[in-house]
């Protein structure tokens, strides 16, 4: 999650938080700081509680690395934002029997479509 308020990741996270979701920021460069009132973790595996959705804003070429990080958690859904998809990442997840995968969709847009 970016600390820059103009960044898409920040805007989407802020929107979802206002809608009632708990947003846990992950950013190695901001580790230990606070964003949106929550502690920032360096890596997904550092989060000491269950994760429902990992919402990824990293470029597509980094999705396989994020998929491996995802597998180190008990997270339920791997979600990459609009414009982000990677077949290798999907294969990594499916081979590990992690089937709840959404790519190339925006969580904010989907929330608006389903609930507003």
What is the meaning of each model-derived region?
Residues 19-21, 73-78, 96-100:
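A short helix->loop->beta-strand "cap" motif at the edges of active sites that frequently abuts
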Residues 1, 82-83, 105:
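Short secondary-structure boundary segments
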Residues 2-7, 13-34:
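NAD(P)-binding Rossmann-fold cofactor-contacting core
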Residues 14, 45, 64-72:
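Amphipathic, non-transmembrane alpha-helical secondary structure
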Residues 33-65:
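Glycine-rich, highly charged phosphate/nucleotide-binding loops
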Residues 70-93:
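ADP-ribose/adenylate-binding Rossmann-like module
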Residues 49, 86-111:
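Short acidic, glycine/proline-enriched helix-loop-strand junctions
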């Amino acid at each position: 999650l970016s600390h820059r308020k103009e960044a898409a990741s920040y805007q989407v996270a802020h929107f979802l938080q206002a809608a009632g979701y708990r947003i846990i920021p992950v950013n190695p460069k901001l580790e230990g700081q606070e964003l949106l009132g929550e502690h920032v973790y360096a890596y997904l595996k550092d989060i000491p509680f269950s994760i429902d959705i990992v919402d990824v804003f990293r470029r597509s070429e980094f999705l396989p690395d994020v998929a491996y990080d995802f597998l180190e958690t008990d997270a339920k859904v791997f979600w990459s934002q609009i414009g982000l998809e990677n077949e290798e990442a999907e294969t990594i997840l499916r081979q590990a029997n992690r089937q709840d995968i959404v790519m190339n969709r925006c969580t904010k847009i989907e929330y608006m479509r389903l609930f507003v």
